[in-house]
Structures are given as C-alpha cells and as structure tokens.
Amino acid sequence: MRRTKLRFLWLSLATFVFPLWAQDSHPSCNKCSGTYIASDEIQAYLNRSPRDAVVTDQQVRAVDVGKSNVDIGVVYRNKTAGGAVAEHDLVSEVYHVIDGSATLVVGWDITDLKRRPADDRAVRLLNGPGGNGASIRNGATYQLKPGDVVIIPAGVGHWFTKIDDHISYLMVRIDPDKVTPPKDEAASKADLAGAGR
C-alpha cells in the first residue's frame, strides 16, 4: 500500500510538477537596453516650464519595454484653487513629488465626465484616451509634499483641488497598450532645443 502511494506521488510529480520546472521563461523585452535620464535633463524640462502657465506636462521619454511602454514625464503646476478632474482609460501614472505642495483627490466616481477629443495633445502624446470631470465623489485626499509618491491606476480620476504655490513632480506612465508614441534621447534633445514646442 505504501509503495503504491509513493509510486502515485512520483508519477504525479513527474506528470505535473517536473514539466513546470523545465519550462523556459523568456523576457518580454529580449535584448532591450536600459534607459538612463540624467538629472540635468529633468531639470532642463523643469526650467523651461513657464511659471505663468497653469500646468506644463512634458514627456521626457517614452520607451518600449516589451509588452508595455514606460514613459517619463515632468509636470509643473502653478498655484490654483481647483481645476478639472483628469482620467486616463489605458495609462496608469506614478507621481514622485520633486518640489512644492498640493492637495490631490483620487477616486473613480467622477462627476460630469466628458471625453477628451482624439486630437487633444494629451490624448495624442501623453496619456491616451480619457476624460475630464467636475469633481470626485468619496475620493481619497492626499496632502502632497516633496518626496511623496502616488500611484494612480488607469481609469481612476485625479484632481488637484489646491496648490499652495506650485508643485513639480516626476511622472512615470505605465502604458500597456502602447497608446503613446515613442520618444528617445535624440527626440528629447530636439524637444529641449525648441523643435518640440
């Protein structure tokens, strides 16, 4: 009886478990290179942000990493007592606050949501299809300061309800559907030289 159980166990392992160990896993971005962005380049984008603009959202890189794009942006927002809610259908965002402070509300229950047109700059170049709304019901409120990080999944509204003086942040956009166009170092340098304005 005991031998029968042991044989059954080994047969089960040989049939189901061992083949799993033998499977090769392959990277989703075979032989891709890493991407480096110097702090001087980030600072150059921040320095060219007009201080009289309500918001300046600039794409620094958009990199194909296999099954997804990962984009890096720099955003500068001026003092305001509110603005529109933003929502992106396909692109998630991660904010890392560099400077300044603000109140950010995040949530999925967006009032008076209206779609952005397909030819909108943000839709074409930054974060794909989405919409803007009037407010967020029952959202989470965060008091952002330098060093803070916020993760905003695709489809979730985000709304700066108050910016004390200004806020600047590095943004990582996760774009699994590759809706944003690629932007490499050469394109970034051309952008900074004035060709992308």
Language-model segments: which ranges?
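N-terminal secretory signal peptides that target proteins for export/translocation
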Residues: M1-L6
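Bacterial N-terminal signal peptides
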Residues: F8-L20
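A short, N-terminal "cap"/entry segment at the start of jelly-roll beta-barrel domains
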Residues: L20-L90, P182-R197
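Short, conserved beta-strand element in jelly-roll/cupin
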Residues: D89-W108, D119-N132
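Short, solvent-exposed loop/turn positions at domain surfaces
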Residues: V91, N138-G139, P146
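Short, surface-exposed beta-strand-loop junctions and turns on beta-sheet-rich folds
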Residues: I110-D112, H166-I167
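Conserved metal-binding segment of the jelly-roll/cupin
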Residues: Y142-I163
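A short hydrophobic beta-strand segment most commonly corresponding to one strand
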Residues: D165-P181
